[in-house]
Design a protein with these regions (language model features):
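Charged (often Lys/Glu-rich) extended helix/loop segments that serve as interaction or gating elements
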Residues: 36, 50-194
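Active-site loop/helix belt of alpha/beta enzymes
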Residues: 1-73, 136
Length: 194
């Protein structure tokens, strides 16, 4: 706000960008961000200036869950390797996350507890390991893994390497509605002149 005054700028609006984490514990709330921005502008007599906020990830990350299904299991001497129909590309396009908020949806209620399971994606890339389960009931083909709080950028940054774009559903009080069907080679090639 002081820069606006010092340089006598006449602005129609001020874009304060993004990077707000109001949904996470021990982070300022959206109200606290708004109050801090307003107080700074008010000190300079700019409280009527239009503010544009780009909260993106802070709002939409919590609005999305991503589901993948176990499609194969391989019993190795020291662990069970689980291959899913999803990929780390779909839940972590910047490859920075060390943990995911997950919930397992099992087809069978009871399963044997096993020492180590490694959940991997469907690509052949070495970084496509999603997480490890230690001393948990064994997952089987058909079990679903829900990744919570993903989606802010994953819908636009997911590469079409091995897997094409997944189905996208909207959930409301009226129920679930398919808003984008899963892509196939047909959609991938639709604008190509080969």
């Amino acid at each position: 706000a002081s820069v606006i005054k010092n340089y006598q700028l006449e602005l129609d609006y001020l874009d304060v960008g993004g990077g707000y984490y109001g949904i996470f514990h021990n982070a300022p709330t959206f109200d606290e961000y708004a109050e801090a921005i307003y107080e700074s502008l008010q000190k300079q007599g700019l409280e009527k200036l239009t503010i544009i906020v780009e909260p993106g990830n802070a709002l939409t990350a919590a609005a999305f869950s991503y589901y993948s299904r176990v499609i194969d299991t391989k019993h190795l001497p020291d662990c069970i390797l689980l291959t899913t129909d999803g990929s780390r590309n779909d839940v972590d396009p910047f490859f920075r996350k060390e943990r995911y908020m997950t919930e397992i949806h099992r087809e069978k209620e009871e399963a044997e507890v096993v020492p180590l399971q490694i959940v991997a994606g469907a690509t052949c890339l070495e970084y496509d390991q999603l997480f490890r389960l230690e001393n948990q009931p064994e997952l089987c083909v058909g079990d679903m893994i829900e990744y919570k709080n993903v989606g802010a950028y994953t819908l636009t940054l997911t590469p079409m390497f091995i897997n094409y774009f997944p189905r996208v559903y909207s959930l409301s009080s009226d129920g679930m509605k398919l808003i984008r069907d899963k892509w196939t080679a047909k959609e991938y090639m639709q604008k190509s002149n080969i």
